[in-house]
Amino acid sequence: MTFPVEKVRADFPILQREVNGLPLAYLDSAASAQKPNQVIDAESAFYRHGYAAVHRGIHTLSAQATESMENVRKQASRFINARSAEELVFVRGTTEGINLVANSWGTENIRAGDNIIISEMEHHANIVPWQMLCERKGAELRVIPLHPDGTLRLETLAALFDDRTRLLAITHVSNVLGTENPLPDMIALARQHGAKVLVDGAQAVMHHAVDVQALDCDFYVFSGHKLYGPTGIGILYVKEVLLQEMPPWEGGGSMISTVSLTQGTTWAKAPWRFEAGTPNTGGIIGLGAAIDYVTSLGLDKIGDYEQMLMRYALEQLAQVPDITLYGPAQRLGVIAFNLGKHHAYDVGSFLDNYGIAVRTGHHCAMPLMAWYGVPAMCRASLAMYNTHEEVDRLVVGLTRIHRLLG
């Protein structure tokens, strides 16, 4: 069956607008995806008709809001095939989820002389928390290098592990190159050395199904806003045996069992002890609607359509004069490129004049930029609502820029 892209586009009101007098071609979903009516309406309805503070409220609105919030936890658990909803922590996004692991599990389990392995393609959110932890603890941060095609040099990975390796923290899909890393092989190698595994799934969950049990990772984290949901909400999955042992890293309301000025404080059980303060309940409701939305379309169908569009885009972009494409032939979601020696910001500004939205800069991946020897790249990302026509507009726009700038 043909993917109903026009029907999908009709669900996203922002796609009907114009930019600089031209129809918007939104090719920046890897930074943040647009929101369908179903998500907007669900969050709006909650604030209009169902809002109340969750937890401990005896009145109807509070009880209903709490139930709705916990139902989304169960729904997200099914979405990634966790064993239990109580393995999922609501966080503000991928960045907070990784910081939670670093400051809770990491503080308890990393010692001087230990090491953590990351890769050269990581987003800053999966670099900086580990740098900070290693500096605090006197541990070593080891880095998996890249091949020129944007895949990891996996032949070097085994030598990076030793009996002091405590964690492999790896992106599922690169936010710049679109590289999908071979997680089963990497996780199996980590297991041989007794290391835990954290997966940054921010660029994966919208493109295909994720099964955390099949992966056998210890931590998996993703953001709602890249999954067509609201900003300020994400999911951290932690294997139950680890989560129950982890101490809280933020204190306040909701995460306690008892508080005494003379006898100290005891914690709520996990996952609630990691959710201090008033939660983003509206965002949680919106995340549930986003999961419903992509599930109703079918992640397999979304993935097939996006891969067809990706192949077309790579073929067409390769014909643009003086373009450099970065990353492997087989990729998910994103195409990073530069045009001649022109700065990415200049190219992106011209494209914006043509109504085309792309991301420019270092994409929170400065070590990757340094590896390629460039200060910045343009990045076009392809989502389920993008079309062949929008790809054609990008190609025409870049060809026009090349003619204008040389």
Swiss-Prot record:
Entry keyword set: Cytoplasm, Lyase, Pyridoxal phosphate, Transferase
Catalyzed chemical reaction(s): (sulfur carrier)-H + L-cysteine = (sulfur carrier)-SH + L-alanine; L-selenocysteine + AH2 = hydrogenselenide + L-alanine + A + H(+)
Modified residues (N6-(pyridoxal phosphate)lysine): 226
Pfam families in alphabetical order: Aminotran_5 (PF00266)
Subcellular location: Cytoplasm
Pathway: Cofactor biosynthesis; iron-sulfur cluster biosynthesis
Any GO molecular function: cysteine desulfurase activity
PROSITE patterns the record matches: AA_TRANSFER_CLASS_5
Enzyme active site: 364 (cysteine persulfide intermediate)
Main location: cytoplasm
Gene Ontology, cellular component aspect: cytoplasm
NCBIfam families: PRK09295.1, sufS
Complexes and interactors: Homodimer. Interacts with SufE and the SufBCD complex composed of SufB, SufC and SufD. The interaction with SufE is required to mediate the direct transfer of the sulfur atom from the S-sulfanylcysteine.
Family of the protein in this entry: Belongs to the class-V pyridoxal-phosphate-dependent aminotransferase family. Csd subfamily.
PANTHER family associated with the record: CYSTEINE DESULFURASE (PTHR43586:SF25)
Protein name (Swiss-Prot/TrEMBL): Cysteine desulfurase
